[in-house]
């Protein structure tokens, strides 16, 4: 009943729980991010389209090709890339994070109701930066202590403040700009169903269960037809 756009880091987590995304996106150029694709989930990967920024780390495409996963490379509006005259393949803006990239792709595919899940963009009360089954959790040790008190912002629901980081603050501000722009000019409604973390201005905050019961009322014919 929903189209699922999944960030690279969430892909192995969704696979672990048997939740199949329609699109998995990635834009990082570091080998650490490529490791999210160093796996073989077999039949689970059938009909998933992996959408990659055109200059991801080479290991990303190597791992995807190894298991014959279906992927495409897309480019942003960078001057150098446009000078190469690959206009036939098209471009789209991607923002600074894979979450921003996913959000922009939903707009280009003309979705009108967008549900955000897992976009905390803030530390949890226990200081953790990601879910406990996030693969690279150890890489963020000490970050909460480093950022505490420096990047506080309004909490989800409007009750009090939460601790954030410089990068998350940047991602949130980009989100807010895109959300308000698409609402104003394209009548796109964005729901934040994260149920925690930072408030993302311009979204409608609702529990995820509410979104499932009120927005997901039509079965979708998957896999989707290929666009020309």
Where are these regions (language model features)?
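Metal-ion/cofactor- or nucleotide/acyl-coenzyme-handling active-site neighborhoods
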Residues: 1-228
């Amino acid at each position: 009943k929903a189209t699922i756009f999944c960030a690279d880091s969430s892909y192995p987590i969704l696979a672990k729980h048997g939740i199949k995304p329609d699109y998995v996106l990635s834009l990082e150029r570091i080998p650490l991010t490529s490791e999210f694709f160093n796996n073989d989930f077999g039949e689970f990967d059938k009909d998933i389209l992996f959408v990659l920024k055109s200059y991801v780390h080479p290991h990303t495409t190597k791992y995807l090709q190894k298991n014959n996963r279906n992927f495409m490379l897309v480019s942003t509006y960078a001057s150098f890339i446009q000078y190469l005259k690959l206009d036939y393949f098209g471009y789209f803006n991607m923002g600074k994070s894979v979450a921003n990239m996913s959000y922009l792709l939903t707009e280009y595919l003309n979705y009108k109701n967008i549900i955000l899940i897992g976009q905390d963009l803030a530390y949890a009360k226990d200081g953790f930066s990601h879910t406990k089954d996030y693969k690279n959790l150890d890489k963020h040790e000490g970050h909460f202590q480093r950022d505490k008190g420096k990047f506080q912002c309004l909490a989800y629901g409007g009750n009090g403040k939460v601790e954030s980081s410089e990068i998350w603050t940047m991602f949130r501000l980009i989100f807010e700009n895109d959300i308000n722009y698409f609402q104003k000019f394209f009548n796109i409604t964005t729901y934040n169903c994260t149920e925690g973390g930072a408030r993302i201005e311009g979204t409608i905050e609702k529990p995820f269960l509410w979104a499932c019961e009120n927005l997901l009322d039509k079965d979708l014919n998957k896999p989707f037809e290929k666009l020309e």
